[in-house]
Structure formats: C-alpha cells, structure tokens
Amino acid sequence: MLEEPIDALETEFENALNSLEDNQLSKINGQLPEQVHVFPLLRRPFFPGMAAPLVIEPGPFYEVLKVVAKSDHKCVGLVLTRSEQAEIYKVGFSDLYQIGVLARVLRIIPMEQGGAQVILNMERRIKIEKPTSETKTLKANVSYIEDDPILTTELKAYAISILSTIKELLKLNPLFKEELQIFLGHSDFTEPGKLADFAVALTTASREELQDVLETFDIRKRIDKALILLKKELDISILQHNINQKIEATINKSQKDFFLREQLKTIKKELGIERDDKSLDREKFEARLKERVVPSDVMKVITEELEKLSVLDMQSAEYSVVRGYLDWLTTIPWGIYSQENHNLEEAEKILAHDHYGLEDIKQRILEFIGVGKLAKGVRGSIICLVGPPGVGKTSIGKSIARALNRKFYRFSVGGMRDEAEIKGHRRTYVGAMPGKMIQALKYCQTMNPVIMLDEVDKMGKSFQGDPASALLEVLDPEQNAEFLDHYLDVRCNLSEVLFIVTANVLDTIPEPLKDRMDILRLSGYIMQEKLEIAKKYLIPRNRKEMGLKALEVSFTQEALRSIINGYARESGVRNLENLLKKILRKLAVNIVREQEEHDKEQAKKKKSSRSKKPIAFVPTKHSITPSNLKDFLGKPVFTSDRFYERTPVGVCMGLAWTAMGGATLYIESIKVAGEKTVMKLTGQAGDVMKESAEIAWSYVHSSIHKYAPGYTFFEKSQVHIHIPEGATPKDGPSAGITMVTSLLSLILDTPVLDNLGMTGELTLTGRVLPIGGVKEKLVAARRSGLKVLIFPKDNLRDYEELPEYIRKGITVHFVDHYDQVFKISFPNKHQMKLC
C-alpha cells in the first residue's frame, strides 16, 4: 500500500513531469539514456509509436517509477518475458527477450488501493546490451535500433495493402478508429516501419508472433509479417461479424415477433375478441364435456376446478396442477360405451380364426355374449386364465376384445410393488398421475373396454403397499362400480369393464383375490393340437412375415411331429414357433443366395449375347422332412421322457404338474444293509413331499401283512428312496401312492406293470385323495407312451370333461383306496415270492 497520501503523490508526480512542457520535450528527445530501468511484461510486447497505459502495483517497480518520474529523461525499458507464467518479481535478464521498447512516462495516476496507472509513449526499439543491476529491480545498458528511412516502391505497395486492410477492419470494428487517430497524431504513413508496428499492434496475435515482429529489423520482412497477421485478424473479424449478425437477426426477429404479438393482443382487446391461453384452456375443457355424459358429482368437482382455474395466475405452480387435473377429468370417456357385438356366430368365427382349441374359454365368452343379448346389456366380469407359458393366454385376450367389438388394453402387473400403480398417486406429489385403470379408460376412450392384467401371480410387496390388495376393489363386481382413484378423487364406474387376468399358477395369488375371479384353466397342448396350431396358424403367419410363399416352403407331417417330439416338448407353442422361425429364416437365406447366383448367370449371358431375354428366377421348392431337419435345428434336444423301457424292481412312474405343464416323475427305491430300519429320501423333495414319503413308509409298515404275509424285510435292511433329476426342486402330495408302490415292488422283488403311471395323495389309512392338473398329467403320460394310468376316483369328473382325442388310447383306472392300486400294479400277485 502507499505510505504517502494520494494527493501528495499526484502533486509530486505532476511536478516531476512539468519538465515535459514548455518546449523541453525536444530537449529530452535528444537525451536518450544509455542506461534504463527495465520493467518485464507478461502478456504481449509494445511497439514504437504506441501510447498505452500500464498498471504498476505497490512494490519494487513502484519505487522505481518514482525514481524515473524525477529523472531527466523519464524513460524505462519494457521487455517481454519468455514465459507467460513467470513470476514478475523473480524475473532475471535470462528470463527476458533481448529486444524491447523504450517508453517515456507521460502521466502517472495514483490509485486508491495502492500503486499507480502510468501513461507511456513508446519511443524506440532497444536491445539489452549489459545488465547493470539484477537484485530487486532490473537495470541495464541499452542500444537503440533505428529503421532504414528509404521508401522503395515495394515498401510503398506493402504500405498501401496494409492501409486497405486496416480500412476493412475499421468497417467491421469501429474500436480501431480511435487507435488509428492516435497513430496519425504521432506518426507518418510514409514510414513503413512504423506502419508495420501499428498494424501488428492492432491484431490479437500470440505473444510469440508479436515478439517475432518486434525483433525483425529488416523493414521489408517486418511489413510482410505484419500484413500476414493483419490479414488473419481481418478473417477473424469477418467471421465474428457474421456470427454477430446471425445472433442479432435472431434477437431482432424474436423482439419483432414479441412486439407484433403484443400489438395483436392490444388490437383484439380493443375489438373485444381477445382470448388468452387461460380462456382457451377453459374452452377446450368445456368442449370435451359436451361430448360426454358426466355424473353429477363429477360435474360439480369439474365446475369448482374451472372456477379456481379462472382466478389463478397462469405463472403459478398451482395453475399447472389444476390444469392437469382438469385435463384428466375431462379426458375420461364418461358415458361413452362401445357398441357390443351380440352375434354369436360372428364371435365364434373370430375366436376360431385366431386360436385353435381353448373350448372352455370360447364357451365362456359366448355365454357372456348370450346373456348380454337377452339382458340388453351385462355387467363386466372377471375371468382368470391359468396355464403354463406359451399356451395363448395373452393373445386370447385380444381375440376376446375383437369378438365382443370392444377396445383392448393390456398391462403387466408382474413385479409391481406399488399400489399407486393401480389406484394412482395423491395430487400433492410432484409428477402425480392416475393409476393404470384410469389410464386404460383414457387410452380406450370407452367405459367398457377389455382390460388384461398380465402375470398377476408375480406381483410383489414393498413399503409402498400391496398391489394385490389394491386389486381387491378393482376386481370386485360389487365395489368397482364406485372405484376411487387417489388422483381423481371422484367415483369412477368400472362395472362395465371385462377384466381378464392371466397367471401361470394360482398358489401365489391371495385367496380373497382368487375368490373374486372366474378361473379357467388352459392346459398344455398335446401332439395333435400342436400339429394343428403349427399348420393352421404358426407356419402361414411366419411364412408371410418372412416373404416366403407356400409353393417355396412346405413342412411334412412327419417333420412337424419330429420337431414337437425332439425339440419342443413344452406345454405351450412359443418355443415351437421360435423353431419354425429359425427354419424359415435359414430357408430365406438359401433362396436369396439362389436368386443372387441366378442374377449373376443372367448378367454373364446378357454380356455374351445381348439378344437373349433374361429368364425369370424360379426358386427351388424346399420341403422340410425328418431327414433334413438336423440341417436346420441340429441334433434333437429330447430323446425320451422314460429312463426305462421296462420298469425294474423298486421303480414306479408317477405324474407331476408344474407351471410349465405336466411331466413324468420316477420314484426309485433300493435296500441298503444296516442294523436299523431307516428310510432315506433324496432328490430335492419339498416339505410336503417329505411328509408323503413318511406316510408311505408308515402305511407300508402297517399294511404289509395284507400284501406279503410273513415278510421279514424291515428287520434286515434300510431303504433309500430317490426322485431322479435331483437338481429340480419337487413338492406336493400327489406322489403318495407312487411311493408306496415303489416300496412294495422292492419288498416283493417284483416290477410293476409295464407302461403304468399313477398319481394320487395317500392317507395313513390307505385312502386315495384327489389331485390337480388332470389334463396336464394325461398329456405328459401320452407324450411318454404310457398305456395305463391310475387316478383318484374323485377326479373322474375332471377326466370326463376332457376332449375325446386326449382320452383316446389310454386306459385310466379310478381308485379310492390303495388296495385297488395294488391289484392294478401287481396283476400276478399270486406268483410273487417273498424276499
């Protein structure tokens, strides 16, 4: 900081500079010092002929400035540092360029925060000859470099070119005009060296480029370098000018549009036809309501919200909330219903056209249509389709909507954990919106659509609520007539909606939810059904999608059977369709290759004899047979469901039912030497199956005297029961009679009847209880080639409901006690010997 008062310093500086006045300037000009103080410059060098300000901060250089101001010559040397990052107070002569300028102090203006602003006039080029002081400040002997005064024709041409370039710059940047006036006051354009220095000083060239010009003493080379830098500056100024023009044009257009809109508003107000955005919003909402029959309680809410909208400021946050709320309220199709199709014959054709089989579901939809026709309208229903993946649960929903002439909306609830997805969010939350039910009505624009809730058995729970519980109100015919969405907060009638729910299993669906649904089971398809589906639906559809024709590609009946048996044994037809697509894609590649080869041959023939007409391409007919199937699909994935062609002792085949459909299940028993009679169970059996094994073990212990009097088996051996495919978890009670039969086969050392399968839950007293999945198990038995089956007697009604083509070719015995199972399993009991 300055120690002396600012006024005193300024007076001192003025007194020191008075020597520049009153004809003493010429005297000083003749007294160029041989030794000067040197001030380092960091950013860019100065050139002779310039006048420029320089800020001197408090410190050593400020003290030097005081000394210079009191000297006779009042001159300092200004030299550029070699590095722009140099520390100004630690710079030595080795850190400076050798060429700089001599600057004369014209005026010193002290600053309040300390230091001073110095107005300098650049006099001459100088060269640092010999440093004389390098302690706190820099001082050196200097020599002066004079320009050659001779003006050649070439230099004159260069000068004219520089002047014309400067004129162009003045047009683009008026700021250069002031600097040009200062130069004209101190210099003459007939001196090309000074003109080059001035031109370079106008540019924004790098410090190294400027220093290079400063160190160029040859006037011809200097003016050439100056012209190059000046041309670069002109190019930059032109580019900057174009950018500014574009920006100004955009701004001016926006301002013009704004003023025109304001004028238009003013004119409309004067004419009485002004309508702002708020009025337009209100008119839009009111226009929607004219097309709808809105319930009175909902209309009351809409009216209140419209009044609130009219008094709110459009810029307020609440305005957008109210506007969004009204948008939803007026978009719901209040009182709008699709005209239903009550023609049974037409509906039956649509359902038959889209899907093969599924008679239970088709019959249920026809019942729905029939009741609607007689009752002049029918309330919505809730149908639950349960079955393994790929059997057509989702696609049948679209067909049902088409058959009823209703709009269709599907969404998956699998993995859903937030009840707000069903019932909506409260309007107080940011980004709130109605639930899926209201969204479905808005999308369909009718109050009686078909809404499908896919994968309802895979819903989850979280701290955000239980979506399954939220569905209780939606799927209850007695409650959904007054469904309340959290966002709308008004009653909405869902009683006309036909809900279709799909699931793979019922076990994970809560009982209250199951109780509200009409459950229809879609069992897996058997061979005959898959063949018909492939021929009538899958092959024609995919052949058309891939641009293939029926004459080009065909499948034999045997090939389709081989695909189903060897590659696609799952209950549905999704994997079967993927395999057919794979075959068709490979055939498409083959046909395209044939066509390319044909085109090449035709092109060659056309070159050799131009007169011949090209022959049209006729693709080779491709027929898929069992012999060439491996070329498309590789080796078969499945060989046989049966481990044994002839059932050995201690082995019995059971029937299982999973989410993927029916399957066969072997129960194997062997005896192991041991001191104690113990039963061991392996094969990833669940808790229920373990209990079934214990029941079977106890039943055999208590009843063996009936089947093999006088046996001593349990006194000698331990028993190990195993369920093959140990990596697959298994559970359920239906293997009870199978386990008993396996144990008795082991004890009696007699195999069970060949091609026999059984299923049924067993009690400790030998009663056989009913099981589930009759159709699925029958399909699995047919796939495995079983000829005789044993089912619980209580499942007879399920069996009789099955189509004849599923029951045909298999003998089924219905039993209610294990004694009957024993007689069927071991028909030659009188020939058995005891072990």
Curated annotation (Swiss-Prot):
SMART domains reported for this sequence: AAA, LON
Active site per database record: S734, K777
Domain (Lon N-terminal): residue spans on this chain: 36-234
UniProt EC number: 3.4.21.53
GO cellular component, one term: cytoplasm
Record keywords: ATP-binding, Cytoplasm, Hydrolase, Nucleotide-binding, Protease, Serine protease, Stress response
PROSITE patterns, alphabetized: LON_N, LON_PROTEOLYTIC, LON_SER
Residues the record lists as binding ATP: G387, P388, P389, G390, V391, G392, K393, T394
Domain of life per record: Bacteria
Entry-linked InterPro entries: AAA+_ATPase, ATPase_AAA_core, Lon_bac, Lon_bac/euk-typ, Lon_lid, Lon_proteolytic, Lon_Prtase, Lon_prtase_N
GO molecular function (one): ATP-dependent peptidase activity
Catalytic reaction equation(s): Hydrolysis of proteins in presence of ATP
Domain annotation Lon proteolytic: ranges: 646-828
UniProt key word Transferase: no
SUPFAM superfamilies: P-loop containing nucleoside triphosphate hydrolases, PUA domain-like, Ribosomal protein S5 domain 2-like
BP terms from Gene Ontology: cellular response to heat; protein quality control for misfolded or incompletely synthesized proteins
Pfam families the UniProt entry points to: AAA, Lon_C, Lon_lid, LON_substr_bdg
Induction text: By heat shock.
Cell location: Cytoplasm
Entry function: ATP-dependent serine protease that mediates the selective degradation of mutant and abnormal proteins as well as certain short-lived regulatory proteins. Required for cellular homeostasis and for survival from DNA damage and developmental changes induced by stress. Degrades polypeptides processively to yield small peptide fragments that are 5 to 10 amino acids long. Binds to DNA in a double-stranded, site-specific manner.
Family named by the database record: Belongs to the peptidase S16 family.
NCBIfam families: lon
Protein's recorded name: Lon protease
Organism name: Protochlamydia amoebophila (strain UWE25)
Gene that specifies this protein: lon
